[in-house]
Amino acid sequence: MNCNVLFLLSVLVSVTAGVTAAYHPTDVFLFNCGDTSNNVDNSGRNWTVESRQILSSNLVNASFTSEASYQKAGVSRIPYMKARIFRSEFTYSFPVTPGSIFLRLYFYPTQYKSGFDAVNSFFSVKVNGFTLLRNFNADSTVQASIPLSNSLIKEFIIPVHQTLNLTFTPSKNLLAFVNGIEIVSMPDRFYSKGGFDNVLRNVSSDVDFQIDNSTAFESVHRLNVGGQIVNEVDDSGMFRRWLSDDSFGNSGSIVNVPGVKINYTEKTPAYVAPYDVYATSRLMGNSSNLMFNLTGMFLTVDAGYNYLVRLHFCETLPQVTKAGQRVFSIFVEDKMAKKETDVIRLSGGPRIPMYLDFSVYVGFESGMIQPELRLDLVPLKDTNQTYYDAILSGVEILKLNDSDGNLARPNPELLVSTDSTPDDSNVTPPIKGKPHVLVIILIVVGSVIGLATFIVIIMLLIRQMKRKKNKKENSVIMFKLLLKQYIYAELKKITKSFSHTVGKGGFGTVYRGNLSNGRTVAVKVLKDLKGNGDDFINEVTSMSQTSHVNIVSLLGFCYEGSKRAIISEFLEHGSLDQFISRNKSLTPNVTTLYGIALGIARGLEYLHYGCKTRIVHFDIKPQNILLDDNFCPKVADFGLAKLCEKRESILSLIDTRGTIGYIAPEVVSRMYGGISHKSDVYSYGMLVLDMIGARNKVETTTCNGSTAYFPDWIYKDLENGDQTWIIGDEINEEDNKIVKKMILVSLWCIRPCPSDRPPMNKVVEMIEGSLDALELPPKPSRHISTELVLESSSLSDGQEAEKQTQTLDSTII
């Protein structure tokens, strides 16, 4: 009995140790090529000299060694300062354990003391029948590296039996070189069996992809998402280097729980990825709750190959502990790779890591030799999850060899021959006495270069035209993947043949409808006018990238022939404009007004700063703010919105966007400054003045024939303490302070010069802060004419034109 117990305990201990322990490779070789003594690098790893048993017999004639002339920043002495340089084809032969191995080649393209300049070195590399590099130039590869570096490591995964034969072949009349060679064994079928679930999903087919044991790989990208660089010695036993994803444009918030324990399992043992990868993650939005952002990760690859995409996940946030709290879809190259990814459900619980494998072919459709592979993680909107977000811990991208055993990218158009081995006897001496031959050669070469340049320019123009033509179709394809698409007949059924009109605008009519599950929705049908496709794309693109308590939720769309419609949540209390109209004769609830103003500000702050791609609305007005049952405001109608990078301070518009009375002056005339997200700030200020009654007094003053510029009388009333035009006599002192704060914030928002206006994140701080912290801004003095606005403006709601024109000189600053 005791023996059985001891046996079971020993088995349990061995299994647990296998799960939690790092990998211990059977083969580890580190060769400092060209060096004469063994050395230790900065990380403590031992590099040895090349053994004569693994060198070709023609060592002296085929190669020589040299030392780099100088050591550039970031370049370690071992293994980069010494190199073996090859005059002719040269083969290393390594005895290895059967299986698959990591082969890492180290290059430092610089000048060497022997006179060799590695910048001008072109060569090919083969191993056991696989072509790893062809006509390879280390310097150009280093120059294009992300992040920038002065040295280079090329990593390959090679199937081996007992011997690894590594051959370097210089291009004709040139030299080849290498600084270091590393060989490390790996677990059996580590990259070919699939993810933690032993499945390798093919994103282009319903049939799973298969990788046999004879496949070679090149490691293209290995990223620690949300974390720092993980150096070789900190890996899980295979000496891989994990780069930070900071250089790849990711802006989602980082998850880093100090001291979190990662619970490795038999399906995901500790050697799959190191602790530092699973302990940090990046949320694809900027908040852990009620926010969503479609985040694209773009990773440069070589066209014409299949790729293995391995994604690592681990839920470490203490509040995410149950299945269903965070669910998202995975898209690779705009194709649905996995619809529902619930890390808690798939892995078995919190702090349990997992990894998924996908295969995708990247062709030449883009016209580029090195296109970008796109990866998107998209939260599912139609689930009752707590956190509308997506999470990612690590990414590995590996290229598979083609049918010819090739991993090298297509040859660049270089005036260098690669077809034979250099030999002095084969070099043709210059022809004396025949200068015309040189002239002919120069003419031919010049013509070829000119023709090639012309062809490249034409190809670029064609590709640009093709992209512009297909931009709308590609956007709609993406919408189909992310949202529910309705046919027009379904819209008629949902709206009961469009019988209940909620509102009308310049771009379409909004109807009330009911889905089959009983949910009430708003159906906005765009007018059948030429050019409305752009408005549709604008609105769906903008709304599909948002999920915030103060932004209207997009539920679906219709894109059928000339029919365009948007299906969104329905809000019972209608628009802010209707709310203001209903309460004109009543003393308003200041707390409600304040809550609405603050909610709108937060929604705009999210559009400007919470999305990976900034969204500028360009049509903020009461009609485009909807109120739910609790008077929570939601920004709606994104037909005029523009998406831009956050670093873009000035936007380019070919038309005037907005509604008279709310358009920022710089949108109408560039004499006021550049167009930016500050244009929304101006519209917000005008909207808040509407809410507190200031715009009503403008109309009264104008109708009485006064030419007073309304900020002037607001300043005067504030100085005299006269605010009865806003709040009446029944307001208490506390509400009086709130209203005054809203006025001051509005006055700052409607400054004529955009640079004088606060950004929306500052506006939120001002509204939430103390009245004592706010100062009265200087009086504005610049006006804009009614005629100028009417001539240049594209109204978002044509029915307001007449009303707004009456007060234009008073309301546009």
Swiss-Prot record:
Bias-annotated ranges (Polar residues): 804-813
Per its UniProt record, what InterPro entries does this chain match? Answer: Kinase-like_dom_sf (IPR011009), LRK10/LRL21-25-like (IPR045874), Malectin-like_Carb-bd_dom (IPR024788), Prot_kinase_dom (IPR000719), Protein_kinase_ATP_BS (IPR017441), Ser/Thr_kinase_AS (IPR008271)
Leader sequence segment: 1-21
Query: EC number(s) on record?
Result: 2.7.11.-
- All copies of domain Protein kinase, residue ranges: 496-771
Glycosylated position list: N46, N61, N165, N202, N213, N263, N286, N293, N384, N401
Tell me which stretches of the chain form a coiled coil: none
Q: Per its record, how is this protein called by name?
A: Probable receptor-like protein kinase At5g39020
Q: Which species is this UniProt entry from?
A: Arabidopsis thaliana
